[in-house]
Amino acid sequence: MTTKLIAGNWKLNGSLAKNAALIDELRRAEMHCVVCVPYPYLAQAQALVAGSLIELGAQDVSEYEQGAYTGEVSAAMLVEFGCRYVIVGHSERRALFGDSDQVVGRKAASALAAGLTPIVCVGETLAERELGEVEAVIRRQLQAVADCVGGEALPTLVVAYEPVWAIGTGRSATPEQVAQTHGFIRAWFSARCDASAVRILYGGSVKPENAAVLFSTDDVDGGLIGGASLVGSDFVAICRAA
């Protein structure tokens, strides 16, 4: 398996001053990581990460290439600002902004067409877990993406398993739960492509205190980090735990 991938999702946070301080801390620590910053800060971040081990990502992308789509940002635009990765299907986009499985699939296809690597987020709610629907939910989410990107593109995806009930709650899934679900995701890909090439990240209340255990769990190839990615010392500690 390839080197573990650690991506920070800044969400709706940051300022010019805070961004500069945070990226400077990551540069000084010589961290190899991805930072997914809000759109307005992409130009600043592109300049700040130049010549470092830090790679740039965005938090969402339009399914459309261009045209009369007010407020949208295309994959080609992200590439011009140095992005290599883009998150698609984050649970907050699905729940708050109505991104359906099909929209997520089209966004992933749009990203791939422009040369971006999509970080495809999948995961279940607490109610779905309690009903025993974890695998059914993730199977549906993955299949919608596969239908849009095609089988040949599957090995190029990054998948982030984010149990919705563990995001921003301080409650992380147990290593056993993570191993079981990541194993299911790996098996799903194995039936369709070379699954060894697919990086499967865990996202959901990853902290310096639990990162090493989570990252040593079977089929965990890194993490998609939310709140802890905004604190330089915490994010550095998480990256080093990988």
From Swiss-Prot:
Pathway: Carbohydrate biosynthesis; gluconeogenesis; Carbohydrate degradation; glycolysis; D-glyceraldehyde 3-phosphate from glycerone phosphate: step 1/1. Keywords: Cytoplasm, Gluconeogenesis, Glycolysis, Isomerase. The keyword Translocase does not apply. The active site is at 90 (electrophile), 162 (proton acceptor). It comes from the Bacteria. Disulfide bonds: none annotated. Substrate binds at residues 9-11, 168, 205, 226-227. GO terms for biological process: gluconeogenesis; glyceraldehyde-3-phosphate biosynthetic process; glycerol catabolic process; glycolytic process. Pfam families: TIM (PF00121). InterPro entries: Aldolase_TIM, TIM_sf, TrioseP_Isoase_bac/euk, Triosephosphate_isomerase, Triosephosphate_isomerase_AS. It is an enzyme of class 5 (isomerase). One of its GO terms (molecular function) is triose-phosphate isomerase activity. Its EC number is 5.3.1.1. Involved in the gluconeogenesis. Catalyzes stereospecifically the conversion of dihydroxyacetone phosphate (DHAP) to D-glyceraldehyde-3-phosphate (G3P). Belongs to the triosephosphate isomerase family. Homodimer. This is Triosephosphate isomerase. It comes from Azoarcus sp. (strain BH72).
